[in-house]
Amino acid sequence: PLLQALAEQLGPWTVNGPVRHVAQSALRDRQQQRQQRERLLAASQRLEELLRRHGWPPAGGSALFQRLVDPRCAALHDYLARRGILTRQFEQPASLRLGLPADEAAWARLDAALLGFKEPAHA
């Protein structure tokens, strides 16, 4: 009964003490928030430009990802996955969501993979 009551109070997404401390500090640090927003927006713009350069103009996105809407998205999803680049695939409409690469090595891998992608043969 006690554990059940506690679980009902806390809910399924509890946050431990150290994480709460870090989160509270981050929420108070306005300069860090501004810098993080600027960094994310710059990275998102970089991703948009990279995709456009390879013939994949984004159909929208946010500071955290870019979205592609194209009939070839399923093939691109599989191709990137085989190269260790994970994307989020949607079927209707055929689309992909690509998150921001984590570091320069990941940016280079994505660039090389997009360069090597060949459109699937049509039946």
Outline where the language-model segments fall.
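Short, flexible turn/loop "capping" segments at secondary-structure junctions
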Residues: 58-59, 89-91
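Residues that cap or initiate secondary-structure elements
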Residues: 2, 72-74, 104
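PLP-dependent enzyme catalytic core of the Aspartate aminotransferase-like
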Residues: 79-83, 90-123
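Conserved PLP-binding catalytic core of the aspartate aminotransferase-like
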Residues: 41, 48-83, 96, 100
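Residues at alpha-helix caps and immediate loop-helix transition turns in enzyme cores, especially N-
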Residues: 19, 32, 72, 106-110
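PLP-dependent aminotransferase class I/II
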Residues: 1-51, 56-57
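A short, ordered amphipathic alpha-helix with a cationic face
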Residues: 11-12, 82-85
